[in-house]
């Protein structure tokens, strides 16, 4: 028998359903202790079906619900409170054929095959970061990915990469199925990639760019806000403002990025109109990340004001404040031109900081949520924590009303 509590009946239907596409909720059910009686389940099902206009009845097929009932009746629960479980299937999970709508950012010097395969093996979508790989190294990581996972995965390719033609040839030749592009226009490469059956996603920082991406045929959009680490948009629009604007501007699935690290922030992104999230910083300091231990520790030591956008005359980049950052800021404050900043930047600054561990002269790219991270975790621990925190957050929202 279900113990009746406010939390079991006060579920935020409209909050969740407005944030996701109509087909995004596969099934939502409440379970208490040992078994749930069929009539009680059917009442909950009827309430779910008719309490909102966003739920699609076509998903309510009898066979699906019968199989879910069988699953419920064969599992006991000993918790003292009703738990609300969310099993989602939306346009993002369908597009990539993944369990959770969680994508790991393809970060330079962090996102090798170990990190990306771990994310894919734990239900998300892992991305190799091609921006810090020579062509031969990319081939090596692609082949190791194929050995490490049989789950979907992809590659992030900055379109301003100097050997972009060679990278795209490798991606096509190696049969990569998913490509995220960034730092440039997707107009040239999207038709070619899609002609080879590749799913294409592009990173944008404004609703205007989202519309242009839809026009050239990309399959989804990553809307990345001001909080994100590394290369950033010139608009300096926060994620809280960017996501609803992008979601309203185009019909493509929107993946939120920038300042997202927990289940709470995933829930927030979805209520704003996203159907998935891309997480960079938290995965950058995961155990499987190829980042140097000194870089990870510096991230853990960073407080709320410890990062700032720099290099705005070149490509706006969020960095940890270190000696290199101070040199950049001094030049910018003095009105330096792009050529002077380029000379200071030189080559290999990001590698020096993130991969080699030079905390003084290296370029330390990381997001604002660094201040929320305090220890190294495995990818499995991160994924488990995000999912549990999301479910707990959505359950708590059921008790909130204005």
Region spans (language model):
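Short, small-residue-biased leader/transition segments that mark boundaries at the very start
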Residues: 1-16
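Active-site entrance/lid segments in N-terminal catalytic domains of soluble metabolic enzymes
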Residues: 85-249, 253
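Short hydrophobic alpha-helical segments enriched in small aliphatic residues
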Residues: 22, 27-30, 38, 42, ...
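Conserved active-site-proximal phosphate/metal-binding subdomains
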Residues: 233-255, 261-402
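Arg/Gly-rich low-complexity intrinsically disordered repeat tracts
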Residues: 48-49
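Short, Lys/Arg-enriched N-terminal segments with co-localized hydrophobic residues
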Residues: 74-87
């Amino acid at each position: 028998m279900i113990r009746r509590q406010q939390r079991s009946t006060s579920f935020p239907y409209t909050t969740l359903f407005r944030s996701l596409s109509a087909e995004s909720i596969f099934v939502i059910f409440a379970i208490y202790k040992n078994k749930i009686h069929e009539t009680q389940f059917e009442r909950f099902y009827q309430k779910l079906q008719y309490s909102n206009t966003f739920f699609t009845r076509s998903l309510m097929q009898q066979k699906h619900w019968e199989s879910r009932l069988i699953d419920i009746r064969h599992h006991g629960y000993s918790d003292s409170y009703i738990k609300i479980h969310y099993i989602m299937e939306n346009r993002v999970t369908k597009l990539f054929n993944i369990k959770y709508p969680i994508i790991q950012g393809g970060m330079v010097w962090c996102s090798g095959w170990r990190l990306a395969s771990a994310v894919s093996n734990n239900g998300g979508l892992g991305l190799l970061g091609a921006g810090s790989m020579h062509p031969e190294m990319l081939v090596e990581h692609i082949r190791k990915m194929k050995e490490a996972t049989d789950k979907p995965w992809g590659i992030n390719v900055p379109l301003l990469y100097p050997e972009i033609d060679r990278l795209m040839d490798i991606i096509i030749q190696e049969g990569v199925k998913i490509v995220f592009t960034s730092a440039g226009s997707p107009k040239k490469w999207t038709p070619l990639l899609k002609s080879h059956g590749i799913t294409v996603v592009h990173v944008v920082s404004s609703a205007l760019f989202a519309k242009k991406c839809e026009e050239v045929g990309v399959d989804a959009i990553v809307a990345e806000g001001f909080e994100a680490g590394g290369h950033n948009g010139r608009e300096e629009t926060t994620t809280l403002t960017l996501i609803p604007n992008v979601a309203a501007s185009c019909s493509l699935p929107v993946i939120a990025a920038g300042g997202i690290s927990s289940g709470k922030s995933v829930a927030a992104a979805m209520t704003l109109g996203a159907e998935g999230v891309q997480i960079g910083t938290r995965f950058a300091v995961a155990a499987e990340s190829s980042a140097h231990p000194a870089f990870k520790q510096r991230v853990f030591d960073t407080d709320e004001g410890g990062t700032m956008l720099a290099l705005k005359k070149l490509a706006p980049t969020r960095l940890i404040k270190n000696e290199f950052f101070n040199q950049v800021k001094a030049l910018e404050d003095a009105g330096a031109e792009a050529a002077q900043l380029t000379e200071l930047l030189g080559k290999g600054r990001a590698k020096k900081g993130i991969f080699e561990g030079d905390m003084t002269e290296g370029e330390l790219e990381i997001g604002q949520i660094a201040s929320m991270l305090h220890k190294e975790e495995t990818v499995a621990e991160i994924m488990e924590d995000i999912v549990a925190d999301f479910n707990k957050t959505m359950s708590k929202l059921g008790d909130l009303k204005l």
